[in-house]
Each structure stands twice: as structure tokens, then as C-alpha cells.
């Protein structure tokens, strides 16, 4: 019994968090964070061809073009106006404030083919090539997502759960499985 109690005590102490060290690390990280700043230029996604309420034609190409042009011009704000915009993956670029006006809704497509080819991303803390996240940036800086609009990933048992690779959630042979 004594041996077992010593073992439990040792295991418990091995799992103890050093809060002082953790807080010092968080303070170091906070010092590296810089406030974003954007030029006054604006880019309206509808000027690049994005249309509302058109589920059959997701407008991610128009949105990504607006973001790219904004970044290439030195930065500014890409505006998603009021309305429902169906979209695929969005890639943010440096010096872009992606702003959703009040009443704006971005509904991401559940068509998994839109999220390929794979991009370098992280899955459970591991760098890997995987499906393009709904909103993505790699190697970019000075980015913000602002506004009172809604970002709707349309996650449901029917749409995203089959990707876990379990038959009980609807996965079938040939489908993408993230496990």
C-alpha cells in the first residue's frame, strides 16, 4: 500500500504545472504582439464579382481577389457588405483588415472538393498538409477580422462529421478522412 501511495504521489507531482514559468512565458509572448494598423483604402467584395444569395456559385474567388488586390496595394480594409455570401476557402494576406458589416453573413460551402488542393496547416499541433481551412493565412502579418457580421461554417452532423472517418458518422469508402 505504501509503495502504491508513493507511486501515486510521484505521478501526481510529475503532472503539476509550473504556473510561474507559464505566466513568464505568456508575458514574453504578449510583448511580441503588435497592434494592427491599416491604410484607409477599402475594397468591396461585390466590386470583384461577389454576389449575395447564390449558393450554386460560391464567391471565394472574388473575395480572395479583393484580399489580394488590397494586400498588393499596400493594405486596407476588405469589406463584406450586408447580405448572405456563399463562399469556399478564404486566404488572408498581409496588411488586410477583413471586415464583415452588420448584417453580412459568410456561409462556407460544405462541398469538400473546394478545400483542396491541400495547404500547409496544423492539425492537433502538428504541421501537415491538409484541407484548406475555411479562413487561412500562412507567413502573413498585420491581419484582422473585424465587424459585426456572421461567419457560418455550416458545421453539422451531416456536413463535417463524416470527415472524422467513422462509418457511424456517415463516412464512406473514398471520402476524405482526417484521422
Regions found by a protein language model. Give the residues of each.
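Extracellular "leader-to-stem" segments immediately downstream of a signal peptide or signal-anchor
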Residues: 5-79, 84-97, 101-179
